[in-house]
Amino acid sequence: NTVGTKSYRRYQNSGVSGTLANVSVMESKIGDQLNITLRDEDGNYVKNQFSLYDQNGFVENNFCEDIISKLRNMKKGETYTIYTWLLSPEDQRSYDEDTAGREVRAKYYDRRGVSIKSNGERVDNYIKFETDDRPYVEGGNISPRIKWVENKAKPGKKKKSAASSEKRSDFFITELMEAVNGH
């Protein structure tokens, strides 16, 4: 409300479920937002909102790339459950140590993403990520990979190439606009 005395936000620790009503991009004071609107079993509309861009102006790669990758495999009117997740460095290291054949790395970082299920089954990515065996092709459903370059300000360190970040971001925005047209 305008007075700020009542919050309409509800935090869901076990995911948000409902029938897919709409997917849209909305401008706001805090930047463009990717909105996925579900209609719950009580008929209430539940808006799941994610910042579309990171602080560098590229598509946010924790949640939005993940969501956009799945949109073309989602249909309006079907029921979905949306979960956000966080995998801590400690959990990743523990998993690698406990799993045969996994290499334990020197350093781990937080990993975040979104899982979407329909009827208990995972919604697969429509967009695949570029690998050595699966190259990026203009107009296809393979996203271009980020290229890492030497950081001249910090010798011995690498940073993301701005050109490859922009190319990847443009790919995801184009894909989002095409997917949203169907919602």
Residues covered by each model-derived region:
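OB-fold ssDNA-binding interfaces and closely related basic DNA-contact patches used
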Residues: 1-55, 59-72, 88-153, 159, ...
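Acidic, gly/ser/pro-rich intrinsically disordered tails
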Residues: 152-183
